[in-house]
């Protein structure tokens, strides 16, 4: 939906002053539109990326105008595929639930090849997503659960959700499985990292139903990074490095998935014989699925 009426309303707030300023600088028969103005930052970003130097297009907007444009992108993702939506924000929950099942099993998980033989999953799993799927996964992760609905008329400069901090060229969300000694004060951490192809949000008290971890006792935690910056789960971040105990996070995601209802109904599946169970991330452990294919380098 590209943010729908929220984006339209914000465009009507921030673009007209920019349009008037730029139009006053133009001599001749050229009339700019709001759409023209909204595309200029894209020219700035993409040309800078392609050429490796700052594009002259970047000089057209002031710093504040770029921040207003940044907020436009926040609205586009938040109300297009993120927490401001109904179904789109849930689309990556089955995947994340299946990924947490792999985390719970540990770093020695085995899978099945196409010929039926077994293999050990690597300690680093990498998946490549587009920007919309990345935002859906971020929404499912829970790191922005305390974000209030974004206003379509006022830019909140203290908002936790700033899409430009993670929806970048090669933007990433990483889920780290940490095995630590003690109750969170140890620096002895062994990490297994699961990455998907960012300052931390404020913390609240940790809601931790699992038994307290005793000193000198091993425990397993989950920590989330957006473009390498740690983003704590607002309701569970008392572990080492603002992490959450893995059992608690697994239950948090499982409960979220259960509350999202039937995926047959969510996706309006009407095809006879269609699968009734969402597997989420079976492609990590089962390479024999008929819909998988190999891509030669």
What are these regions (language model features)?
Residues 1-125, 129-297:
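Signature for phosphate-centric chemistry
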């Amino acid at each position: 939906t590209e943010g729908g009426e929220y984006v339209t309303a914000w465009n009507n707030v921030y673009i007209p002053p920019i349009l008037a300023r730029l139009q006053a600088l133009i001599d001749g028969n050229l009339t700019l539109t709001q759409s023209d103005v909204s595309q200029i930052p894209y020219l700035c970003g993409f040309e800078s990326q392609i050429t490796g130097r700052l594009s002259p297009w970047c000089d057209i907007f002031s710093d504040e105008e770029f921040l207003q444009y940044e907020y436009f992108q926040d609205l586009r993702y938040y109300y297009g595929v993120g927490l401001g939506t109904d179904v789109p924000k849930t689309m990556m929950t089955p995947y994340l639930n299946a990924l947490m099942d792999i985390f719970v099993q540990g770093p020695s998980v085995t899978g099945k090849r196409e010929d039926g033989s077994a293999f050990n999953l690597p300690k680093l799993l990498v998946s490549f997503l587009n920007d919309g799927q990345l935002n859906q996964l971020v929404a499912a992760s829970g790191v922005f659960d305390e974000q209030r609905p974004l206003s379509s008329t006022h830019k909140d400069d203290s908002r936790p959700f700033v899409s430009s901090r993670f929806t970048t060229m090669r933007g990433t969300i990483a889920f780290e499985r940490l095995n630590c000694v003690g109750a969170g004060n140890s620096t002895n951490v062994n990490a297994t990292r699961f990455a998907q192809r960012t300052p931390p949000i404020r913390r609240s008290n940790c809601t931790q139903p699992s038994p307290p971890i005793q000193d000198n006792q091993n425990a397993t935690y989950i920590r989330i990074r957006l473009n390498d910056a740690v983003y704590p789960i607002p309701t569970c971040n008392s572990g080492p490095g603002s992490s959450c105990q893995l059992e608690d996070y697994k239950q948090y995601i499982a409960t979220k998935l259960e509350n999202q209802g039937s995926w047959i109904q969510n996706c309006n599946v009407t095809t006879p014989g269609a699968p009734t169970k969402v597997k989420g991330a079976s492609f990590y452990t089962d390479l024999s699925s008929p819909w998988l294919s190999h891509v030669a380098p």
